[in-house]
A protein has these predicted regions:
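Glycine-rich, basic loop-to-helix element that forms the pyrophosphate-binding segment
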Residues: 3-5, 40-59
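Acidic donor-binding segment of Leloir-type glycosyltransferases
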Residues: 5-41
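Short, acidic/glycine-rich phosphate-metal binding loop used to engage nucleotide
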Residues: 38-46, 124, 148-149
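Short beta-strand-to-loop acidic/aromatic patch adjacent to the donor-nucleotide binding site
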Residues: 61-75
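Conserved donor NDP-sugar-binding/catalytic core segment of glycosyltransferases
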Residues: 75-110
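A recurrent flexible, glycine/aromatic-enriched loop bordering the glycosyltransferase active site
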Residues: 102-104, 118-135, 151, 157
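Catalytic donor/gating beta->alpha subdomain of glycosyltransferases that bind UDP-sugars
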Residues: 149-150, 156-212
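Membrane-embedded multi-pass helical conduit in multi-pass membrane proteins
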Residues: 224-296
């Protein structure tokens, strides 16, 4: 078998919790995993779970150099830890190294396949990592870990703060983890996109006015395609219905995105689905942006946006 289950310091919430995923914590303990229980009087976020697990490790292993973070629905490839450690040992200016995450069952649905395409990021220096990554403890401590107030997008936000401190992030050409998105319905995909919009908005709120204008472009793109264009077309159509033809800008955008991604050689059908998903996602993402806006305006804490 090409992978093994990593020994993780995981977290419990009611039942077993590993960064927000419910499972049997008794089974985890039987496998030799240490289970760390969260204080449920404090609102749960994956960022808080990661921080508490990391801090427990650091306190009990003071000489620890690196921590491998893994999402609860992932399995680590057996040769990944050595490859990641070798890279970090030889590159002291890097805070994070990550590899290729793959979908375990891409054939089960087009949505799983879209996730697998999303995981296929470019090899080389990166702006951010995902939930699976080997992180240097000294760098993690320098930025005080993840922002526990974020309900999504905590990894790119922490990576932004690391880069401000002159740390680097690297994506190496190596298989890292297998992930089970388990997305088989359109509604699941919709909620996942909505969560992404919420993440963009919350990160932009924190750092959008910095030199990098962090995530501002993403938020503006969402607002432009989901609201500005439809409103403009609707207003013009009041004067002359012929302006409805401007709605063709959306299928044209799908074709443009498909053309720009032709080098991925996904096949005609998957390429079109992938391009269409990027364009259609602007609407659920906009709902995520709006939800963040209302939560911020009325001083409400954000709730996790689950998709499975």
């Amino acid at each position: 078998e090409c992978y093994h289950r990593a020994r993780l310091y995981a977290l419990r919430r009611q039942r077993w919790m590993c960064l927000g995923d419910l499972d049997s914590f008794e089974r985890a303990e039987s496998l030799g995993v240490h289970v760390l229980c969260l204080d449920l009087s404090i609102p749960f976020t994956a960022a808080r779970a990661r921080n508490e697990g990391a801090n427990y490790l650091i306190q009990n292993k003071p000489n620890l150099d690196y921590i491998q973070f893994v999402d609860g629905d992932c399995i680590i490839y057996s040769d990944w830890p050595k490859k990641a450690n070798d890279f970090m040992n030889g590159n002291i200016d890097y805070a994070i190294v990550c590899g290729r995450r793959r979908e375990r069952y891409p054939e089960n649905s087009i949505y799983n396949q879209l996730c697998d395409i999303e995981w296929d990021t470019s090899v080389g220096d990166a702006l951010a990592c995902g939930g699976d990554a080997l992180i240097r403890v000294s760098a993690f401590q320098q930025v005080d870990g993840y922002d526990e107030g974020l309900i999504a997008g905590e990894e790119p936000e922490m990576c932004f703060r690391l880069r401000i401190k002159k740390w680097k992030i690297r994506r190496i050409d190596a298989d890292m983890t297998l992930h089970d998105a388990a997305i088989v319905r359109f509604g699941q995909w919709w909620n996942r996109a909505k969560r992404a919009g919420y993440a963009y908005a919350s990160s932009c709120y924190l750092h959008g006015l910095t030199v990098e204008v962090f995530k501002l472009k993403d938020v503006l793109s969402i607002v432009f395609w989901a609201t500005c264009i439809p409103l403009l077309i609707a207003l013009l159509a009041v004067y002359n219905p012929i302006f409805v033809v401007l709605l063709l800008v959306y299928p044209l955008q799908v074709l443009k995105v498909a053309w720009l991604n032709r080098h991925k050689k996904l096949g005609f059908r998957v390429t079109l689905f992938h391009a269409a998903s990027i364009v259609i996602a602007k609407w659920p993402q906009f709902l995520g942006v709006v939800k963040f806006g209302f939560n911020t305006l009325f001083g409400r804490s954000g709730r996790l946006i689950e998709y499975k």
